[in-house]
Structure formats: structure tokens, C-alpha cells
Amino acid sequence: MLDVKKLRSDFEGVKAQLERRNGTIEGLERFSQLDASRRTMIQEVEELKSKRNDVSEQIAALKRDKKDANSLIAEMKQVSERIKEQDEQLRSIETELEALLLTIPNIPQEDVPYGESEEDNREERKWGDVPDFSFEPRPHWELGTALDILDFERAAKVTGSRFTVYKGLGARLERALINFMMDMHATEHDYTEVLPPYIVNRASMIGTGQLPKFEEDVFKISEEDYFLIPTAEVPVTNLHRGEVLQGEQLPIAYNAYSTNFRSEAGSAGRDTRGLIRQHQFNKVELVRFSLPEDSNNQLEIMTTHAENVLKRLGLPYRVVTLCTGDLTFASTKTYDLEVWMPSANTYREISSCSNIGDFQARRANIKFRRDPKSKPEYVHTLNGSGVAVGRTVAAILENYQQEDGSIVIPEALRPYMGNVNILS
């Protein structure tokens, strides 16, 4: 949520910054109109209350002098009724303003490149050599099916499209990756491991920005105001909802493994095969709470931690800065890590690392004190994938495939696979 004081004091400036995202921001003009009405109404109510006070004093004076005050009493009754009506209208306007404020996205940082789509994202760096196969590389869904480690048909029978059954060494590979990533972040990158609930309440989803704007993209539990998490960012960020942290605690860093659930309502027809876009998938999430002046530094640190996973696995990747039009709703700056996928001859997203600024902290009321006597300030929150597990499975199958269809296991994973070094 944006700082409403800044929005009111510099509306045109904020509007110009937000329009760098993708043009007109829905709800912004309505907010301005309503806020102007609110200010006018507050002034009117204050004038009416002042008038009521004056009339009350006049009535008291007349009564002291034992004079007729009936006409003034009638006038005061009318004024009181108008105040009551205006107060009700004011409450209605303020409720709508609060709802509108929840639908306005975050402001991009000044160094975020301007653009309208992913085509305008800026490449920052590359790592690793893409494999040079002497044969036509096969897509991961063909490899996994042939090895009998991925079963898309039975998953569709059990549930529907965009689900997968992992079998045998495929299931073991997924589990090995989760343990490898969690261990790496906890022991080498100094994160505190968290195992959060996979079901959260509405307040948590509002706190991190999924609701109210993106309710169609998440799964809601029928007859309960609970939601299946689309990412561990939701429960982990909300661990400190409504709290005031101590400045010396910051930065706070958590890593969490979770299964995630997304309806992918806006992705019909995209990535219908394989592991890239699933309704249910596993991911290791990184969440950081930071001092405001240190959050961009923390973004660089967190992005490096996600990169280290791909480096250790020997997977070629690149880092891109998302342009203004490709930023997510809550982000002020995002780096995407894109892993090389040989069958498509392109890089595909495997991690997004974002600085959210105080956007979530305002929604979830997460603050800190620099010292015991200082006024609480909003923290900055950051989150990133460290990394998406299913997409890592897909990348390993494709980048480590052999001509006979077997898959070499990356050396770093072999201790987690019982020293299995090849899938065949």
C-alpha cells in the first residue's frame, strides 16, 4: 500500500511514476476525486460542528435570561441531523478510499528500465556455458515420461490438467532439490528455516498484496475465508504482521519450503505441457526484513543467494531487471533469474527476487524502532525464489540429458540422491 500522505501531497508526481508501469492506473483518478470530496466534506462537517457549538451557547444564554429558545433548538436539531448525515457519507467515502488504496500498485524505482512487456527487460549478466549437444535436445516432459519418473496422464486422471505425478527417482530428485536448497540457504547464507502453514486467512493475503486485486488467481477454501498459499512469501511475511521489531534485529532472513497453489487464471494456453506452469508446485522461498536505507543492498545479497543455487547445480542462467511494465503489483524493483532450457533454445524464469519497499509493511502494519525511544517506522520487505523446484527439475533433465535419454545427476545433488549419479 502506498503512503497515503505522499499520494495526497504529490498526486500528480505519484501518478506520473505509476504510469511508467503500463499507462493509466485503474482506480487512481477515482481515488483523487473521492479524496477531494472527503476534504470538502470534512471542512463542511467542521463548520457545522462549529455552528452547533455557537447555537448551543446562544441557547444556554437565552435560557439563563429565561427567554424563548425554541427556534434555536429547532435549528440545532437540523444542524445535528446534517452532521449525522455528513458523518455517514464521510465514513462511506473513507471505506471506499481504503479499498481503492489496496488496488493501487507500488511505485517503480527510478533505475528500473521503462518498458511495456518482458521484451523490454534489461539483461544484467550471464553465467555458465549453454550445452552444445551433438543431437536434437528433447523437452523435459518427453525425457521424464520416457524414464517413467514423471506421469502427466495419471495426474490428469486423478485431478486435471497442469498437475504432475513424480515417480521413483523423479520423486527422489524433487525431494533432493528441496533439501539441497534449504540446507544451502540455512547453513551457507544464514537464513532461519521456517515451515509455515499452507493455508492462510484473508488478512494475510491482503498483507502481501494478493488480495483484493488477484483473488481469481488463488484457490479459496469453500465456506471458509481461508486460501491455499500461492507462495510461502504470504505466511512468512505475515509472521511479523502487526509487530514492532527492534532495529538491531534487522535484517531478518527466513527461508521456507512450501507447496504452492495457483489457478493460473490469466495463463490459458501458455506452457500447457511439462513442469513450467502448474497449479501445484514446490518452491523454496527467501524472505527478508530490512532497514529502509539498506533494502536495495539486501536485494543484491538475496539475488546472489538464489544465483548460488544455480551455480552449484551447474545450470546456465542469466539475470534480468524487469522493466516497469513487467513488474509485479507489489514490487518496486525485481531481478529475474532465467535458466537455459535447451529444447526451447531460450532462457526461462526460475526465480524472481524483489524489493517491495514499505508496500507490504504498510498493508500488514510491520514496523521497527531504531532505538527504544524512537518513533516506529515501516520496515522494508523483500522476497525471492531460492528457487522454484519443479522448474529446476525441468532444467536438470534438459541440460544434463544424454543422447540415449539418460540424465546425469549434478554432482552437488548426488549426496542427496544416495549417490545415484545417472537416471536411466
UniProtKB/Swiss-Prot annotation:
GO terms for molecular function: ATP binding; catalytic activity, acting on a protein; serine-tRNA ligase activity; transferase activity. InterPro entries: aa-tRNA-synt_IIb (IPR002314), aa-tRNA-synth_II (IPR006195), aa-tRNA-synth_II/BPL/LPL (IPR045864), Ser-tRNA-ligase_type_1 (IPR002317), Ser-tRNA-synth_1_N (IPR015866), SerRS_1_N_sf (IPR042103), SerRS_core (IPR033729), tRNA-bd_arm (IPR010978). SUPFAM superfamilies: Class II aaRS and biotin synthetases, tRNA-binding arm. Pathway: Aminoacyl-tRNA biosynthesis; selenocysteinyl-tRNA(Sec) biosynthesis; L-seryl-tRNA(Sec) from L-serine and tRNA(Sec): step 1/1. PROSITE patterns: AA_TRNA_LIGASE_II. One of its GO terms (cellular component) is cytoplasm. GO terms for biological process: selenocysteine biosynthetic process; seryl-tRNA aminoacylation. Residues 109-129 are annotated as: Disordered. Catalyzes the attachment of serine to tRNA(Ser). Is also able to aminoacylate tRNA(Sec) with serine, to form the misacylated tRNA L-seryl-tRNA(Sec), which will be further converted into selenocysteinyl-tRNA(Sec). Homodimer. The tRNA molecule binds across the dimer. Consists of two distinct domains, a catalytic core and a N-terminal extension that is involved in tRNA binding. PANTHER family: SERINE--TRNA LIGASE, SERYL-TRNA SYNTHETASE. This is Serine--tRNA ligase. It comes from Shouchella clausii (strain KSM-K16) (Alkalihalobacillus clausii). The gene is serS.
